[in-house]
From Swiss-Prot:
This is Bifunctional purine biosynthesis protein PurH. One of its GO terms (cellular component) is cytosol. InterPro entries: AICAR_Tfase_dup_dom_sf, Cytidine_deaminase-like, MGS-like_dom, MGS-like_dom_sf, PurH-like. It holds the Pfam family MGS. Its EC number is 2.1.2.3, 3.5.4.10. PANTHER family: BIFUNCTIONAL PURINE BIOSYNTHESIS PROTEIN ATIC, BIFUNCTIONAL PURINE BIOSYNTHESIS PROTEIN PURH. The gene is purH. Pathway: Purine metabolism; IMP biosynthesis via de novo pathway; 5-formamido-1-(5-phospho-D-ribosyl)imidazole-4-carboxamide from 5-amino-1-(5-phospho-D-ribosyl)imidazole-4-carboxamide (10-formyl THF route): step 1/1; Purine metabolism; IMP biosynthesis via de novo pathway; IMP from 5-formamido-1-(5-phospho-D-ribosyl)imidazole-4-carboxamide: step 1/1. CDD domains: IMPCH. It comes from the Bacteria.
Length: 524
C-alpha cells in the first residue's frame, strides 16, 4: 500500500477541478475519484483511480450507491495511530484529503417546472456523508467543499508540504456549515409541500435560514449592546445593503446599516431618478427629478434639520455635481448609490468621515422578487413576505364627487409610495413629485397629520394645494378636517374603515378629491 497521501475527489461543481487535481499531484498526492469527476480527470490525462476499482464494488442503482463503502469511510474516519491495525487488516488506505461539493439541489428546485422526482434525485446522500466524515476527523483529514479554497490549500501545500491543523479545522467548520445549509434547503422545500407538491405553502413546517457574518460591529443599537452584521447565504442578488461596497469613511455602525437599508429600500420603489434622505429609519425628505442634483436639493429642503447626519440614497449613479452639492450643503452619515461617476470620490474626500457606498444595479420596482422579512419577538420569529405591493392609477377607486387632476394623481401615487416606508401611523404631504411634510410614528393618525403640517411650515413649504397620503384608513373624519385646514386638495388612503362614509362625506364637504387603494402599508 502506497505511503503517498491520498485525495478523494467527487464534485458536482467542476470549476477549477482540473487545475486543482494537477496541483495535488505535484504536491505528491494520489487521486481517487467517482463517476463524472473521474471521467473528466482521466479524459484530461490526469492520473486517477476510480472508486469502484479501489473498493471492488461497482456503482449501482443509477449512481445512488458509489462511495457508501467501508473502504471509503474507513479511510476517511480512521484515526491515525489508533485505527491503523484495523485499516491494514481490511486493506483500507488512509484518505488524507476529501474534495466534495454536493448535487445542485437549489438550482434544480428553482426551476418552475421541477418535478418531485427531479427534486428527490438531486438530494445528495454520499456527498454529505463523506463531507461530515472528513469534517469529524479533521485532526487527520482535510475537507474542501468550495472551489474558492482550492488556491489556499495548494499554496499551503507548496509552502509547508502539508495542510495545517488550523486550516483543517477552518475547512471542517465550513464543511458543517455547507451541509447544514444544504439540509436546511431540502427541509424548507419539502416541508412547504406536505399538502401538495404542485401548490406549496409559503411557509414550511420548520424554517431554516443560514446567515454568514459579514462583519463585527463596534456595538449595537446602543453602546452597551454587542452586535455583528450577517447576510443571507443565498440572497436575492439585487443591489442592497448586504451587497454594498464601502469606498470611504468610517466603519459602518449598526444604526448606519439599518438606516441605509431603509433609505435604499425606499429609493428602489421609484422607477424615475429619485433621492431619499432617511433619519432613524424614517424618510425625512424624498423627491423625484430627472436632474439628480435637483432631486437631492429638493429632498433636503423638506426637512433640513432632520437631514443633518442622515442617510442619502439614490437609484441612479451618483454624479460629481450631486456629490459636490452634498459636500457643500450638509453632513451625512452615509451616501449610497448603484455606482459612482468617475471623480466622485475626489469630491467626497473633503468629508473623509462620510461613508460612501455603492450597492450595484437596482431592479425596476415591478421586477423585484419578494424576500422574507423577519421580526424577532421573545421566544420566536415573525416571518412575512416583503411588502412590495404596487399601486397604479388603474387600481385607484375615486370615492368623492371630485376627481383628482392628472397632476394630483401623480402626486398621490408618489406620496403613497413614500408612506409605505414611514413608520406608522404615517402621513405624507407632497406636491410636484416631492415631499413637503412627513408625520411619522404617532399613536394617533391625526397627530401624524398635524406633525406633517408643522414640518412643512417649519421648512417654509406651502401645504395649500398639496396632496396627502395615509398608510392606513382614517378611523374618524378628524383627519380629513385637519387636512382641509392646511389646504390639502387630494387624499390617498386604503379605505376599509367602518366610518368610510363619514370620511368621504367630510372630503366632499371640503371639496377634496379622495381615492382608496384597497391596500394598507403598516410599518412597525
Amino acid at each position: 500500500m502506497s505511503d503517498k497521501p491520498y485525495a478523494l475527489i467527487s464534485v458536482s461543481d467542476k470549476s477549477q477541478i482540473e487545475s486543482f487535481a494537477k496541483g495535488l499531484i505535484e504536491a505528491g498526492y494520489d487521486l481517487l475519484s467517482t463517476g463524472g469527476t473521474y471521467r473528466l480527470l482521466s479524459d484530461n490525462g490526469i492520473a486517477v483511480t476510480e472508486v469502484a476499482d479501489y473498493t471492488g464494488f461497482a456503482e449501482m442503482m443509477d449512481g445512488r450507491v458509489k462511495t457508501l463503502h467501508p473502504k471509503i469511510h474507513g479511510g476517511i474516519l480512521g484515526r491515525r495511530g489508533q485505527d491503523d491495525a484495523v485499516m491494514s487488516e481490511h486493506g483500507i488506505r488512509p484518505i488524507d484529503l476529501v474534495v466534495v461539493n454536493l448535487y445542485p439541489f437549489a438550482q434544480t428546485v428553482a426551476k418552475p417546472d421541477v418535478t418531485k422526482a427531479d427534486a428527490i434525485e438531486n438530494i445528495d446522500i454520499g456527498g454529505p456523508t463523506m463531507v461530515r466524515s472528513a469534517a469529524k476527523n479533521h485532526e487527520h483529514v482535510a475537507i474542501v467543499t468550495n472551489p474558492a479554497d482550492y488556491d489556499v490549500v495548494l499554496q499551503e501545500l507548496k509552502d509547508t508540504g502539508s495542510i495545517s491543523q488550523k486550516t483543517r479545522f477552518d475547512l471542517a467548520v465550513k464543511a458543517f456549515e455547507h451541509t447544514a445549509h444544504y439540509d436546511g434547503m431540502i427541509a424548507n422545500f419539502l416541508g412547504s409541500r406536505l399538502e401538495s407538491f404542485e401548490a406549496p405553502d409559503s411557509f414550511a413546517r420548520t424554517f431554516n435560514v443560514q446567515l454568514q457574518k459579514a462583519q463585527d460591529l463596534r456595538y449595537g443599537e446602543n453602546p452597551h449592546q454587542k452586535a455583528a452584521f450577517y447576510v443571507e447565504a443565498n440572497g436575492s442578488g439585487e443591489g442592497s445593503i448586504s451587497t454594498a461596497q464601502q469606498h470611504q469613511g468610517k466603519e459602518l455602525s449598526y444604526n448606519n446599516i439599518a438606516d441605509t437599508d431603509a433609505a435604499l429600500e425606499c429609493v428602489k420603489s421609484f422607477s424615475e431618478s429619485a433621492c431619499v434622505i432617511v433619519k432613524h429609519a424614517n424618510p425625512c425628505g424624498v423627491a423625484i427629478n430627472a436632474d439628480q442634483t435637483q432631486a437631492y436639493k429638493t429632498a433636503f429642503s423638506t426637512d433640513p434639520e432632520s437631514s443633518f447626519g442622515g442617510i442619502i440614497a439614490f437609484n441612479r449613479p451618483l454624479t460629481k455635481q450631486t456629490a459636490q452639492a452634498i459636500v457643500d450643503t450638509q453632513f451625512a452619515e452615509v451616501i449610497i448609490a448603484p455606482s459612482l461617476e468617475q471623480g466622485v470620490l475626489d469630491i467626497t474626500a473633503a468629508k473623509k468621515n462620510v461613508r460612501v457606498l455603492t450597492c450595484g444595479e437596482l431592479p425596476s420596482p415591478d421586477q423585484r422578487a419578494a424576500q422574507f422579512d423577519y421580526k424577532r419577538v421573545t421566544g420566536g420569529l415573525l416571518i412575512q413576505n416583503q411588502d412590495l405591493g404596487l399601486i397604479t392609477a388603474d387600481d385607484l377607486q375615486v370615492v368623492t364627487d371630485l376627481k383628482p387632476t392628472a397632476e394630483q394623481l401623480n402626486d398621490l401615487l408618489f406620496t403613497w409610495t413614500v408612506a409605505k416606508y414611514v413608520k406608522s401611523n404615517a402621513i405624507v404631504y407632497g406636491k410636484d413629485q416631492r415631499t413637503i411634510g412627513i408625520g411619522a410614528g404617532q399613536m394617533s393618525r391625526v397627530n401624524s397629520a398635524r406633525i406633517a403640517a408643522i414640518k412643512a411650515e417649519h421648512a417654509n413649504l406651502a401645504t395649500q394645494g398639496a396632496v396627502m397620503a395615509s398608510d392606513a384608513f382614517f378611523p374618524f373624519r378628524d383627519g380629513i378636517d385637519n387636512a382641509a385646514e392646511v389646504g390639502i386638495k387630494a387624499i390617498i388612503q386604503p379605505g376599509g374603515s367602518i366610518r368610510d362614509d363619514e370620511t368621504i362625506a367630510a372630503a366632499n364637504e371640503h371639496g377634496i378629491a379622495m381615492v382608496f387603494t384597497g391596500m394598507r402599508h403598516f410599518r412597525h
